[in-house]
């Protein structure tokens, strides 16, 4: 066993973060980032740091491992298409049930809520479940407070909307807080996409940019969970670089393969 594998085994055993689910190159990038921050050059040295019960570092590492790149209205062409999906659903179903799977710090489900409101949907008929495995990320999501940084301008991200000020409140020069009108549409809860039970009856599931970080053998369980959570005719949206494996591909028809939106078909 290499020093890196020993480190991963410790992380999984002592923190509960399932390193075995994730692509090893992804884990290496994230762990190495923490090592550089702490001035540690060897995996064995970083393991010693964690073994010394450095709770702060363990928390920082878990945050680094769990939270992926996220922003409001990431890939605008996808959100333009999703607006049409929501309008179509509003004409065909009484209540629109949406699941944002692996929602990280909440920007995706809040984007979905803002989009629904911006499209003129009745908020009483829209319900969004947002789940993630990381409790700290969920706490940040529930707070709904986001700050612009040098590399991520929240104002630019919200520029997809005509009137973003209807959905967020400014707090100082850099911070934005999602208002209650948006928050009321979203419920957050913890869920593990690999080991957790499927949901049921959803009209739309967003599972974007999740599988690109996951080891190949666990991608199928994730997409199996997602497909079982959609009603017949429900919509699935994946990340721009993600594809459906053959084992679940037959359960879907591509609505627009360029932007990875699919419809659930009846089981045969």
From Swiss-Prot:
GO terms for molecular function: protein-glutamate O-methyltransferase activity. It holds the Pfam family CheR_N. PROSITE patterns: CHER. GO terms for biological process: chemotaxis; methylation. Keywords: Chemotaxis, Methyltransferase, S-adenosyl-L-methionine, Transferase. The keyword S-adenosyl-L-methionine applies. S-adenosyl-L-methionine binds at residues 68, 70, 74, 108, 132, 192-193, 208-209. Residues 1-265 form the CheR-type methyltransferase domain. Its EC number is 2.1.1.80. It catalyses: L-glutamyl-[protein] + S-adenosyl-L-methionine = [protein]-L-glutamate 5-O-methyl ester + S-adenosyl-L-homocysteine. Disruption phenotype: Mutants show lack of Htr methylation. Catalyzes the methylation of several Htr transducer proteins (methyl-accepting chemotaxis proteins) to form gamma-glutamyl methyl ester residues. This is Chemotaxis protein methyltransferase.
């Amino acid at each position: 066993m290499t020093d890196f594998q020993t480190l991963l085994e410790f992380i999984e055993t002592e923190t509960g973060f399932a390193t075995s689910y994730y692509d090893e190159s992804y884990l290496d990038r994230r762990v190495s980032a923490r090592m550089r921050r702490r001035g540690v050059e060897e995996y064995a040295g970083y393991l010693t740091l964690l073994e010394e019960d450095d709770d702060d570092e363990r928390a920082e590492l878990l945050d680094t491992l769990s939270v992926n790149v996220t922003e409001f209205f990431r890939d605008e062409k996808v959100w333009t298409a999703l607006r049409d999906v929501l309008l179509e659903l509003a004409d065909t179903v009484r209540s629109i049930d949406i699941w944002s799977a692996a929602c990280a710090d909440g920007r995706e489900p809040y984007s979905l809520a803002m989009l629904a409101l911006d499209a003129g949907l009745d908020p009483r008929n829209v319900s969004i479940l947002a789940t993630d495995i990381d409790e700290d990320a969920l706490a940040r999501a529930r707070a709904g407070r986001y700050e612009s940084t040098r590399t991520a301008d929240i104002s630019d991200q919200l520029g997809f909307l005509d009137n973003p000020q209807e959905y967020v409140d400014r707090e100082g020069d850099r911070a934005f807080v999602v208002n209650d009108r948006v928050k009321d549409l979203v419920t957050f809860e913890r869920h593990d996409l690999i080991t957790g039970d499927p949901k049921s009856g959803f009209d739309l599931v967003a599972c974007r940019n999740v599988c690109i970080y996951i080891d190949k053998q666990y991608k199928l369980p994730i997409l199996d969970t997602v497909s079982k959570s959609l009603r017949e005719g429900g919509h699935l949206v994946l990340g721009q670089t993600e594809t459906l494996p053959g084992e679940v591909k037959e359960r879907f028809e591509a609505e627009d393969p360029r932007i990875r939106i699919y419809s659930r078909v009846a089981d045969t």
